[in-house]
Structures are given as structure tokens and as C-alpha cells.
Amino acid sequence: MEAEAAAAVVASSASASASAGRSRPSSSAAQVTSNSAVRAGEENAASLYVLSVIDSLKKRITADRLTYIKNRIGENKTNISSYTQRTYNLSKNRQISTSKGTDSASNLLTKRQDDALCTLHSLDIIPVDKDGGTFQDESPFSSSNVMFGGNLGPKNAIIRPIKLPEVPKLPPYTTWIFLDRNQRMTEDQSVLGRRRIYYDTSCGEALICSDSEDEAIEDEEEKKEFKHSEDHIIRMTVQECGMSDAVLQTLARHMERAADDIKARYEILHGEKTKDSCKKGTEHNVKVEDLYCDKDLDAALDSFDNLFCRRCLVFDCKLHGCSQDLVFPTEKQPAWSGVDDSVPCGIHCHKLASEPDAAAGADHMLFDVEEPTHSSDNVMNQPGSNRKKNGSSGRKTKSQQSESSSTARVISESSDSEVHPISNKSPQHSPSPSKVKIGPKGGIRKITNRRIAERILMSVKKGQREMASSDSNFVSGYLLARDMKLRSDTRNGNKELIVSSQQSSPSTRSSKKKSTPQIGNSSAFAEAHNDSTEEANNRHSATDGYDSSRKEEFVNENLCKQEVYLRSWKAIEQGLLVKGLEIFGRNSCLIARNLLGGMKTCKDVFQYMNYIENNSASGALSGVDSLVKGYIKGTELRTRSRYFRRRGKVRRLKYTWKSAGYNFKRITERKDQPCRQYNPCGCQSTCGKQCPCLSNGTCCEKYCGCPKICKNRFRGCHCAKSQCRSRQCPCFAADRECDPDVCRNCWVGCGDGTLGVPNQRGDNYECRNMKLLLKQQQRVLLGRSDVSGWGAFLKNSVSKHEYLGEYTGELISHKEADKRGKIYDRENSSFLFNLNNEYVLDAYRMGDKLKFANHAPDPNCYAKVIMVTGDHRVGIFAKERILAGEELFYDYRYEPDRAPAWARKPEASGAKDDGQPFNGRAKKLAQNNRG
């Protein structure tokens, strides 16, 4: 029994625990359900609150709108009542004046007719006889007599009207814009995807021109703009309820827009409000210069790169467009240099700033170099003056320093005793020089002494440079650097003097003996050197500690100045300096004047360049500084290579007649194919198979980035005098005009020799293959044509093959030309001209007067597509001698299957039905004179 009772207890406890376990999940699920219900209720409450806010805003906007409409209606009612009252008063006054007339029943129209007839005094009035006969003159312009009744003249008078002769109507004329050069079509002028409406003269109504009746036009999605009321609701709702997803969704449902659009619109509105509040009072104080100070040169020139055309050298080029691909040439032009580099550019020029310091340094060094003997005056006075004039005119360039150091090295090896003692003289302990008479060979001694002194000064300069570079790499090129060098050179030179005097070898002594006889009184010269050496050694121990402390002060001061000075150079100033080095070389005067005007002076530019050059070995340069150093080295290398070329023979180009006629083979192969559009390549080396020009079948031009030795580059001609109008000229044979930048003898100038070109000596000495480039066209007149419509006429007589003018127009694609040509064909006109494989010229809206030149099977002109500085252009030339006043005709040369009926040849007119449609649009072609 006890066991059964225990089992029952265990079972009941297990069932209780199981029921408890089942009740826990059910309670948690109920809690989750209650939380979701609470959250849903909160969201509903929030959405209801947002809706209430939106409704209140709508009601407020509606009330404001109603008030505004009522006010406008009241204002309009007042204005209309005043206007109608004035009109009513005028009508009433007219009625009163009419009622006062004698004949109240008279018709106003009849009265006006009588008044009008009474004013016709120029008409012939013929009286009528009693028998009814009249006197008439026989005239071709007379017509039947008309009898007028009324008060004009005698009763039953007959008036003979005048019949004007018939004048033919003027031909239809289209308004067009004159173009002196071709221009690319803008996107808004395209007719693709649009329906064209034209007037059909046969049926007398306007029709829609389309390629097919089922042509579907893609309708662009209408972009709904936000109204002012919607902006107000969005702004006020977000301010009242905050920016949340529920608010955005409610606004989107209410306005039937996307939630992202609502959010973007609010950000725009909020940004405009913040921007307007921040810019109040400070907009007009911002300078244009301050906008670019913190930018890099590339960022500042972003708009320049997009708007400036490097082929036409104009801004906003209509031919090549904006945002062209930048092509940087591999070969840079040599740096330009001024006429006289020794003339200072201004009061802040580095030449003026460095002359006093250099002169003072020279005096400090040369004061003790004078010998105490009788020959010292002749030895050292002349070199001192030469050094003040020539040696201390400022900092030398790197090449001059290297030359002086090499010279000093040779002198020091030959005469070491002449260098070290003299370089360590001090001006405070030097003995006074004595005056001695000069012997009969004094002139020779003067010259010899001068040369020796110059060598000594060059060796001293070498020692200064070596000691200064060993002491500090950051001191040279800035203020007080020269004084620090002199102090360190004096101390170190004394040490070298002691070592060299104690450890002199017999060979050195023998060299001394060989060199001292060149100077008069060698014993006195040696005694002076020994005395100066002892005095320098005595001074060295006393001033060593003082000089070392002063040196540390100078170094620390100069380092601080350099750091502050380098921070003052902004990014755009460093970029302009790099450009200046590329254009003008190391000429700091031209760089400061042309690129850094108002920012940095000539002295600042000079010091910065020296700092970059002297500290490049330490590896502390970065960014623009290393780039400046690269340009400095590159400029020196280019200058040196040009120097060696001038010393040698004249460098001849690797140019043969075979390479000059490289394009002739291509011409003959593609005789019947259209010209290829040229696009510059950006190759940085000799063009290979990947070159776009080579793959496109065109030659590389001067606008390409490849070097001049590229085999695919067109090299121009070497024609002499006026031989460029024959097929011996490579340019003329390739249907190109000569380019003054490429062709050797084809000059372009003012004719007076001011630009370095030969003086103009008549027509036989100038290139005659640059007519389109120089715009040397004939005068063309516009008049009524005897063939059709308007025509072009020549004002002056011309000879055969003379250039008349250019056929200009819009550059459009072939697809665009097919669409436009359908309208032109229906109007029986043609203004399309095939230019190359990409573009067609359309002169309907824009062009020159030669667009009116008509077609003729036997013309007196011909058209020719010519490449002029990389662009294809159409020139009109005389096929025969044309007299003044003759009309110009040329063969449009339509393709046989696309020519209209009036342009087909007589023998081919019946081969094809005139009413049969043809594929494509009729386009003019240039004459092929490549034969």
C-alpha cells in the first residue's frame, strides 16, 4: 500500500511539473503577442497623429488659398468695373453725337465709303456726255470703266482704275545663321525620336513625316515636380512629428510619391534653408582668390581643362566640344629664356638681394689675402676687383658651381701651398701691405698674379661649399647661411693648414718651388705665409668655443626660419612653380612675374628652388617638392643636350621621300572609301599595334602624345617656294593643307620678318596650299538664280583651280542626316554633304553663302574634302576660268541609287522609275581628284 501511495505521489508530481512546463511557453507567447499588439497600437496612433497633422496643414493651406482667391477676385472686379464703365461712357457719347446728325437713317458704312472716295484725287475722272459716250485712251494698263455713284465729281462720272503690272514672286527663303567654320550639332537640335511636320504643296496641308506609320516614339516619364504647398506640408510635418519611417510612409501615401523622394526633397529644403542662413552677410565678402588658395593646381584648372580646346586654342569650342580627352605630349618644348638674364626684374629680385651679401663676403675674404711684401699689391688687388664684379654677383647655378669646383680641384693638386694659407687669413691681424716698384716685367707679373689669385679664389669657394655641406644640409640657400659658411670655413681651413704644413711631402715642396718663382720675391711670399699661419693658429684656440656656440645658434635659427617659410608655400603655389619650371626653366624672374604675381617674389622663388635642390639628397622631400626637383634636373639635362647639339654638326631629321609619301599608299588603297575621322592618340612612346590612330587608319598628327620619331606620324613636306600645289608635295597628294608647325618651308607670318621668318617676297615665295587655314577665299554674292531659287555668284574673275570658299555647316551623324534628309527630299532641296565616315555637313540651318550654289551636270566648280590641322573641311575650287558675275555650279555627285530625279544624268534618267522610293537620303559627295 505504501508503495502504491508513493507511486501515486510521484505520478502526480510529474504531471504537475509537466503541466507547469506547458504553461510557461504559452505565457511567453501571450506576452509576445501583447507586445506586438502594443507596438501596432503605437504605430497606428503615430500614423493617426501624422494624418491629423497633415489634415490640419491641408485645411490651413486651403483656407489661405480661399482667402487669396477672394482677394484677387475683389481686385479684378474693381479693375473690370472701371474698364467697362469707361467703355460704356465712350459708346454713349458716340450714340449722342450720331443722333444729332441731319440724316438719322443714313448708313454709317455708306458715309465712310463716300468719305473714302472723296480722298481719291489721283484717279482720272471722265465726264459722261449726254449721249452716253466717253473719251478713252488706248493703254495696255487700262481696264473697263467703272461708274461710281455719290457726291464725287459730276453726276454719273466714270473713274478709270489703274492695273499694276504683274511681278514674279520671290523664291522661298529660309532664315539661316552664317558660319565661318564648321560647328558640331548640339543635342537639343537633334530630330531623332521626334516627329517632323512639313507642308505638302500638292495636297496643301501639313503632314507628319515618319519612316513608317507604326513608328513608335518613346515617351519619357513625366517627372512630377513638388509644388509649393507640398513643400510646406513636408517641412511642417517633419518639424512637428520628426524624421521617421512611419512619417515618411504616411507622407508618401498621402502625396502618391515614393518615400525616398520625400526624404530627398526634405534634405534639399533643409539644406537650402541652412545654406541661406549661413551665407547671410558673408556672401559678398568672399574673394575669388581665396576660393583657390587651398586647392591644388589640378583642381583649380578643372574648368580650364573642360572648357579650353587645345586644338583650336579657344574656350567653349563649337567644333570639338568641351570635356575633351587630355592628351599630354611626350616631348616637351624647350624652356623659354629671356633676352638679358643679368638685368634685375624689380626691387625684390634675387640678384639685387644677393649682390651686397656677396660683395661683403668677398671683402671679408680678400682683405687679408694681400701680401705684406712689395708684390702683394699687384697680386691681390686685381683679383679682388674681378671677384666683386663677376664672382659675387649672386648665387651661381648648379652647372657653374660644378665647373668652378672642377677647376679648383685641378689647381689644388698643382699648387696646394697657394690655397690653404691664403684662405685662412683674418682681416683683424693682417699686416699692412707695402708698396714696391715694379720692374720692367711688371705687366707680365700682373697678369700672372691675377691668374693665380683667381685660382685661389675658386679653391676657397670649393672649400666653403664642402665645409658648409658637411656642417648642415639645411642651411644653404636661406638668410644668414653665407655668414655661417664663412665662419665654419675659416675654422676648418686653419685645421687643414696645420696638417698640410706639418705633413708636407718632398713632392709638395718641389711643387712649391716650381710655382713660387712665378710670383716675384718668393722668400717674402713664404715669410708672409708663415706669419699668417702662426697668427691664425693663435686666434683659433681663442675663438673656437665662441664660433661653435654661434654656429649652433645660426643653425637652429635657420631651421626654424625654413620650417616657417616652407609652410607659407601653399599647394597651388607649388603647382604653379612646377609649371613655371616647365615653361621658363630655372628663371625665377619669369616664374614670379608670369605665374606667381602677387603671391611670391622673385627672391622667394629663387630661395625655394635652392632649398629643394640642396636637400634632395637627404630624402626628406615629398609630393610637389620631389616633382620640383625632377623638373629642375630635367631642365638642366635638356639644356645641356641642346648645348652639345649646337657645338656639333647640324642635326638632320630622319626624313626621306619614302616616309614623306607614307600616306600615298593608303590613299590609293582607300580611293573609293570615305575619309576617316581623326582622333588624337595618347601614346607616351612610339605607336604600336594598340595605337588608336593606327587601328583607325589615320596618321598621327601634332596633337597626338607620341614623339616625333613615331613611324605613323605625318611629317609634312620639304617643298621649296610655291611647289605645294603639285602632286610632288606630300601634303597636296594626301588631300591635306600644309601645316606651318610641321612643314619645313611653309611659313606663316606678317611678312616683315619680326617673327623670325623670311621677309615676304611675293606670291612665288609663299605656300599656296594654306588657303582654308588662312581663310583666303573669294568674294561671293547672293542673288536670284536662273536655274532654281537662289544662287551664288562670283564678284571677281578667278583662274583655274583657284580656291573660292568653304562649304560650312553643322556636323551631324549619318543617322541624323538620314532623318533630316527625308524632309529635304520632300521640299526638293539638298544641303547635306558627306564629310567622312562619322560626320555629315548640314547647311540648312547654318552655313556659308556657298550653300546656295546649284547643281549642274557640266559645272564650273568642284568640291574637295581637305584635312586642315587634323579636321576635314570642304573647299570649293574653280574647275575652269570664271568671269566676274557668273553663277557658281558644281556637281553634287549623288550616289547613283540615291540621287533625286533632277540630279540624275540624262542617260540614266529612264533606268529607274522616278516615283520609286530609294534607300537612304541624298547626300553630296566631294570630287575625287586623287587620280
From Swiss-Prot:
Q: List compositional bias (Basic and acidic residues) regions by residue number.
A: 528-549, 903-915
Q: Does Repressor appear among the keywords?
A: yes
Q: Found in which tissues?
A: Widely expressed.
Record's subcellular location: Nucleus
- GO terms, molecular function: chromatin binding; histone H3K27 methyltransferase activity; histone H3K27 trimethyltransferase activity
Q: Which GO terms describe its biological process?
A: heterochromatin formation; methylation; regulation of long-day photoperiodism, flowering
- What are the disulphide bonds in this sequence? none
Write down the Gene3D superfamilies for this protein, in alphabetical order: SET domain
Reaction equations catalysed:
L-lysyl(27)-[histone H3] + 3 S-adenosyl-L-methionine = N(6),N(6),N(6)-trimethyl-L-lysyl(27)-[histone H3] + 3 S-adenosyl-L-homocysteine + 3 H(+)
Q: Which PROSITE patterns match?
A: CXC, SAM_MT43_EZ, SET
Per the record, its GO cellular-component terms are: chromatin silencing complex; nucleus; PcG protein complex
Q: Please note every region of biased composition (Low complexity).
A: 1-30, 500-509
The UniProt annotation puts the region (Disordered) at 1-37, 372-450, 491-549, 903-931
| InterPro entries the record matches | CXC_dom, EZH1/2-like, Hist-Lys_N-MeTrfase_plant, Pre-SET_CXC, SET_dom, SET_dom_sf, Tesmin/TSO1-like_CXC
Q: According to the UniProt entry, which residue ranges have a biased composition of type Basic residues? A: 386-398
Q: Which UniProt keywords apply?
A: Methyltransferase, Nucleus, Repressor, S-adenosyl-L-methionine, Transcription, Transcription regulation, Transferase
CDD domains tied to this protein:
SET_EZH
Show where the CXC domain sits.
664-763
SANT domain location, by residue?
565-615
Q: What is its EC number?
A: 2.1.1.356
Compositional bias annotation for Polar residues: 375-385, 423-433
Similarity comment: Belongs to the class V-like SAM-binding methyltransferase superfamily. Histone-lysine methyltransferase family. EZ subfamily.
Q: What does this protein do?
A: Polycomb group (PcG) protein. Catalytic subunit of some PcG multiprotein complex, which methylates 'Lys-27' of histone H3, leading to transcriptional repression of the affected target genes. PcG proteins are not required to initiate repression, but to maintain it during later stages of development.
Which protein, by its recorded name, is this? Histone-lysine N-methyltransferase EZ1
- Give the originating organism: Zea mays
Q: What is the lineage of its organism?
A: Eukaryota, Viridiplantae, Streptophyta, Embryophyta, Tracheophyta
Supply the gene name.
EZ1
